[in-house]
Regions:
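Low-complexity, glycine- and small/polar-enriched segments
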Residues: 1-207
Length: 207
């Protein structure tokens, strides 16, 4: 007897923003700038349940009840600002902001409830297993480049909030003639939260 439930979904929220400004030498502006902002948000609730319920199982060599979650949830934001002002007297403000948020509520359950086993021919191997192998990522990147009299400001924020509920349960059951019994919940999660902000300012020439 074999029952399995699997969730292998790939869920992503991606955002990007870019700002570009170019000034020639004849530009008399005393102030210029670029602003780029990007926000990526995931609000995810997932659940997978493998269940054997209200069953009488006779003479089974093995009973396997397996719940598996094996996917990825990604939030990524990218902000890019480029200012190529070449005017001699201008001041350039170049700003980039990136925010990435992952809010994850995940459940992986293997449940045997009100199950009766008998085996007149030998012993039964019972496996009740819940396992989660998710990849959960929140990442933000900003990059700023200003040419001329410039100021570069960059901010990258990432937030990863994950509630992973992994359960293996055998309840209200009467198991007879059992050779081996394996009931466990296993997690092998990869969780990454990363930010990167970079800015390059080149001095202006002229008066």
């Amino acid at each position: 007897v074999s029952v399995s439930a699997a969730d292998k979904s790939m869920i992503g929220a991606y955002s990007g923003a870019a700002a570009l400004k170019k000034q020639g030498a004849a530009n008399s502006s005393k102030f210029g700038g670029t602003l780029a902002g990007a926000v990526a948000y995931n609000g995810v609730k997932t659940g997978v349940t493998a269940q054997i319920k209200d069953a009488a199982i006779t003479d089974a060599q093995s009973i396997t009840n397996l719940a598996t979650r094996e996917g990825a949830v990604v939030a990524a934001g990218l902000a890019l600002g480029v200012d190529t002002a070449t005017t001699g007297g201008a001041t350039s403000l170049n700003a980039g902001v990136s925010a990435s948020v992952n809010e994850i509520n995940s459940g992986t359950h293997a449940v045997m409830n009100n199950v009766t086993t008998n085996n007149a021919k030998g012993k039964t191997a019972v496996n009740n297993i819940a396992q989660s192998k998710d990849i959960q990522v929140a990442g933000g990147i900003t990059a700023q480049y200003a040419k001329g009299g410039g100021i570069g400001i960059g901010a990258a924020v990432s937030s990863l909030h994950a509630a992973n509920d992994i359960q293996s349960r055998i309840t209200n059951s009467d198991l007879h003639d059992i050779g081996t019994l394996k009931a466990y919940a296993q997690t092998d999660l990869v969780q990454v939260g990363t930010v990167l902000s970079a800015g390059v300012i080149q001095g202006h020439t002229g008066n």
